[in-house]
């Protein structure tokens, strides 16, 4: 038996012992996780700085705070969510007790990713712990400083058998996927998501896949362009564009393209100064391979702003592309970098058609003062989530499920949805062992009963 198999088997044995069943145990583990985060805030920030050039402020407000809020929300709501839920009865079951009982699935595997290596690894773990599962954590090896830190500190605070951390790269993940889990949650790209799903199918293991896509951002002529562009620039260029729900490209009328460029430039200079490379708030690309990939997407494009990079530091300047050919590579794959293409459309209907001709995105954004236009965009398109007149913030609302649709993923989590994702809703009926006379019509022989109808 391999070391990874031993770790998974220990987690299953610990789960089978029943120790996760009591709510008090789950809450104690969540409280320990909260304590771990608060006592290691500086270490977490240091790892994020080393991996992605995030400063302490960005590390806290882009990652740590969301997990702390999720833990508080879970602890507060867990007794309510875990309680048996009575359901409506049929005429034949009026004397019975009918309810839904939430039970843990078993051993859950969470495979994190590198762009928000703390949040996307630990936030789903919060829900899995709350639901009473054992959780095997596999951080991304690309954000190696965060991966090493989590492998060090998690065993110091949480039950070591129930919540192990597996370090390593593709070989270790491949070995993990040979094991039988009761649920797998993966965050990453669509190609790997398909590999995860194929591996899970061998054991009929359900999956939650948080993938990606090209998130459209439609800007109506009838809106405050200063506010719109400031909000778009914030969401697009935070973490150097390496955010799965960042706006990937802008759709707008040709008449406002130049205004959008100028207002984006103004916002970028406000955020990061004349030279973003010198800004403590501006991130870096995770590694050289991704640096080369993003730089390659700009080849042959009309650059209105930025377009430069430094391979030695993996810095790519905030970049705006105009008059973009929709058949070019930059419009065929998720950019996942600080490059914003602008595509011109002449109407809302054309924008909707453009969006619907492509794979369903993880997020969709629309800026307009016209509520009917916003409702039309929502009604006639499909995406994992929507924010109108801002970007990204729907992900921060614990009561809204976070997930994709189609090529951008399946399943969702956050808040109550996390508890539901990592629970089995068990249908329960408890009948009194009395008054069998009322059930006599169901018993054979049936011939005499049939002649009466």
Swiss-Prot record:
Any one Gene Ontology BP term: lipid metabolic process
EC number(s) stated in the UniProt entry for this protein: 1.2.1.5
GO molecular function ontology, one term from the record: aldehyde dehydrogenase (NAD+) activity
GO cellular component: cytoplasm
Reaction catalyzed: an aldehyde + NAD(+) + H2O = a carboxylate + NADH + 2 H(+); octanal + NAD(+) + H2O = octanoate + NADH + 2 H(+)
Active-site residues (renumbered): 210, 244
Binding sites annotated in the UniProt record for NAD(+): 188-193
CDD domains in alphabetical order: ALDH_F3AB
Residue numbers carrying N6-acetyllysine: 178, 194
Pfam name, any one: Aldedh
Main location as per UniProt: cytoplasm
SUPFAM superfamilies: ALDH-like
PANTHER family per record: ALDEHYDE DEHYDROGENASE (PTHR43570), ALDEHYDE DEHYDROGENASE, DIMERIC NADP-PREFERRING (PTHR43570:SF15)
Family: Belongs to the aldehyde dehydrogenase family.
Biological role: ALDHs play a major role in the detoxification of alcohol-derived acetaldehyde. They are involved in the metabolism of corticosteroids, biogenic amines, neurotransmitters, and lipid peroxidation. Oxidizes medium and long chain aldehydes into non-toxic fatty acids. Preferentially oxidizes aromatic aldehyde substrates. Comprises about 50 percent of corneal epithelial soluble proteins. May play a role in preventing corneal damage caused by ultraviolet light.
Name of this protein: Aldehyde dehydrogenase, dimeric NADP-preferring
Gene name of the encoded protein: ALDH3A1
């Amino acid at each position: 038996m391999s070391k990874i198999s031993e770790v998974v088997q220990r987690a299953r044995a610990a789960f089978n012992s029943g120790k996760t069943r009591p709510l008090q145990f789950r809450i104690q583990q969540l409280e320990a996780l909260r304590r771990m985060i608060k006592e290691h805030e500086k270490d977490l920030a240091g790892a994020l700085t080393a991996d992605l050039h995030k400063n302490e402020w960005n590390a806290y407000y882009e990652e740590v705070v969301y997990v702390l809020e999720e833990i508080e929300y879970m602890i507060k709501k867990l007794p309510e969510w875990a309680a048996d839920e009575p359901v409506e009865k049929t005429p034949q079951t009026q004397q019975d007790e009918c309810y839904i009982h939430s039970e843990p699935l078993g051993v859950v595997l969470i495979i994190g990713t590198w762009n928000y290596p703390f949040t996307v690894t630990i936030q789903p773990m919060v829900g899995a712990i709350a639901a009473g599962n054992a959780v095997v954590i596999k951080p991304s090896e690309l954000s190696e400083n965060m991966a090493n830190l989590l492998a060090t500190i998690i065993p110091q605070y949480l039950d070591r058998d129930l919540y192990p951390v597996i370090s390593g790269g593709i070989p270790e993940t491949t070995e993990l996927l040979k094991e039988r889990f009761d649920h797998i949650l993966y965050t990453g790209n669509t190609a790997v998501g398909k590999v995860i799903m194929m591996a899970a199918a061998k054991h009929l293991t359900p999956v939650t896949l948080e993938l990606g896509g090209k998130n459209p951002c439609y800007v109506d002529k009838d809106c405050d362009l200063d506010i719109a562009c400031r909000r778009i620039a914030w969401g697009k260029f935070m973490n150097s564009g390496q955010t799965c729900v960042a706006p990937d490209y802008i759709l707008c009328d040709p008449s406002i393209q130049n205004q959008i460029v100028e207002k984006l430039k103004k916002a970028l200079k406000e955020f990061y100064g004349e030279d973003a490379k010198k800004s403590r708030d501006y991130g870096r690309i995770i590694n050289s391979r991704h640096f080369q990939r993003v730089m390659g997407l700009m080849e042959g494009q009309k650059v209105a702003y930025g377009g430069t990079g430094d391979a030695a530091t993996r810095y790519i300047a905030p970049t705006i592309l105009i008059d973009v050919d929709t058949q070019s590579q930059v419009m065929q794959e998720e950019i996942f970098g600080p490059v914003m293409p602008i595509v011109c459309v002449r109407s809302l209907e054309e924008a909707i058609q453009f969006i619907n001709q492509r794979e369903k995105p993880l997020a969709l954004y629309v800026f307009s003062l016209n509520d009917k236009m916003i409702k039309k965009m929502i009604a006639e398109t499909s995406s994992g989530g929507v924010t109108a007149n801002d970007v990204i913030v729907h992900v921060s609302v614990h009561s809204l499920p976070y997930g994709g649709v189609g090529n951008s993923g399946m399943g969702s989590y956050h808040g109550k949805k996390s508890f539901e994702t990592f629970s089995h809703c068990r249908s329960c009926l408890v009948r009194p062992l009395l008054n069998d006379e009322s059930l006599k019509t169901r018993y054979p022989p049936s011939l005499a009963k049939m002649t009466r109808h």
